[in-house]
């Protein structure tokens, strides 16, 4: 289709990227009478995003303009390329089918439905996100990415954020989304973030793998893998909810693998693994609850820290800790380290139907396993 009459090369949809100072969540400083909690939890993956079905064009919700590969198209007229690799309805719906090109950006709401194999990549030294929804003059940003088939694939690469929304962001469907950022976040939402469906999400960032300033929900039967470099694997500015029975793997080189400001809730048969090479594995200023799910946490000196306490209910939790240099450093229930190679036994009182046990003597990083068959409130392990 011919979209040149709808082309406009000025305005914020065509502006170059912004230099992104890494938005980092600070590591929580322990307060009160106890310090970081040591814990390991085997967990399953919940992955793939929530994006809701594509909505019909609506003036109230439509994008004000989009930019595809450096060319701006204004709302009201459909646009696309002759090969059919991308098509925009002039409102809020865009389809990708074999797209291999540059930046896709919108002001306002944008629903992206991808089919087949698609690649979005920024040019060298471009300081903006590869796929981005930002606030417009009158419309708030919202980005929804979805697929229809398990063979669908979306690959996004950038020096800055790979996928970003200055509002809410959702990923859903059975397809695969791979994001790579060399200097920033793999996926970032300034609002809430949701991943739903049965697909796979792989997010790798030079700072965070996956980050939201609001609530993060992973309600998926698929797989979500998040890898952070200088930042967290998964970071939530509010609550982090993992459910749906899938697998979630979070890794970080320097920070905690999983961080949430308000609390972490893992349930529904989900399997979660968290591994940090430089800090504790799971960190929250709120509480941690694991219900009918598993958590496996590996960190340095500490496995899990939940400032407002931990609750296990029919959960399996495994924690492994090691001192710098990889030397095993067993931790006692009070949070102090011990030179003994024997993992200390659990000394906390438990409900009759709950079971907490230590693993046998080992010279490898310290490991603990907690198995509960009823709700077990704990302040720390």
Predicted segments with their positions:
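A composition-driven surface/loop motif
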Residues: 2-30, 52, 61-381
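Sec-dependent N-terminal signal peptides
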Residues: 20, 35-49
């Amino acid at each position: 289709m011919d979209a040149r009459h709808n082309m406009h090369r000025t305005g914020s949809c065509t502006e170059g990227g912004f230099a992104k100072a890494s938005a980092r969540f600070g590591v929580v400083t322990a307060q009160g009478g106890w310090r970081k909690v040591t814990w390991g939890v085997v967990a399953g993956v919940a992955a793939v995003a929530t994006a809701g079905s594509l909505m019909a064009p609506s003036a109230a919700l439509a994008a004000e303009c989009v930019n595809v590969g450096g060319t701006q198209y204004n709302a009201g007229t459909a646009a696309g390329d002759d090969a059919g690799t991308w098509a925009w309805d002039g409102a809020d719906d865009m389809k990708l089918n074999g797209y291999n090109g540059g930046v896709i950006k919108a002001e306002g709401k944008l629903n992206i439905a991808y089919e087949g194999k698609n690649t979005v990549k920024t040019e060298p030294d471009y300081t903006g996100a590869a796929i981005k929804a930002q606030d417009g003059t009158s419309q708030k940003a919202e980005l929804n990415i979805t697929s229809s088939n398990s063979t669908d694939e979306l690959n996004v690469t950038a020096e800055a954020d790979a996928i970003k929304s200055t509002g809410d962001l959702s990923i859903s469907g059975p397809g695969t989304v791979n994001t790579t950022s060399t200097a920033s976040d793999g996926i970032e939402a300034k609002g809430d973030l949701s991943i739903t469906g049965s697909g796979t999400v792989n997010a790798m960032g030079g700072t965070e793998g996956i980050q939201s300033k609001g609530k993060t929900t992973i309600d998926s039967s698929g797989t979500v893998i998040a890898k952070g470099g200088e930042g967290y694997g998964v970071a939530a500015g509010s609550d982090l909810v993992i459910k749906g029975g899938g697998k979630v793997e979070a890794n970080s080189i320097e920070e905690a693998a999983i961080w949430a400001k308000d609390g972490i809730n893992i349930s529904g048969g989900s399997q979660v693994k968290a591994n940090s090479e430089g800090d504790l594995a799971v960190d929250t200023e709120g509480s941690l609850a694991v219900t009918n799910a598993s958590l496996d946490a590996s960190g340095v000196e500490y496995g899990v820290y939940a400032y407002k306490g931990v609750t296990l209910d029919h959960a399996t939790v495994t924690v492994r800790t090691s001192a710098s240099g990889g030397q095993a450093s067993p931790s006692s229930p009070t949070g102090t380290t011990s030179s003994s190679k024997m993992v200390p036994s659990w000394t906390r009182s438990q409900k009759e139907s709950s079971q907490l046990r230590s693993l046998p003597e080992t010279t490898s990083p310290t490991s603990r396993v907690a198995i509960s068959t009823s709700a077990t409130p704990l302040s720390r392990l």
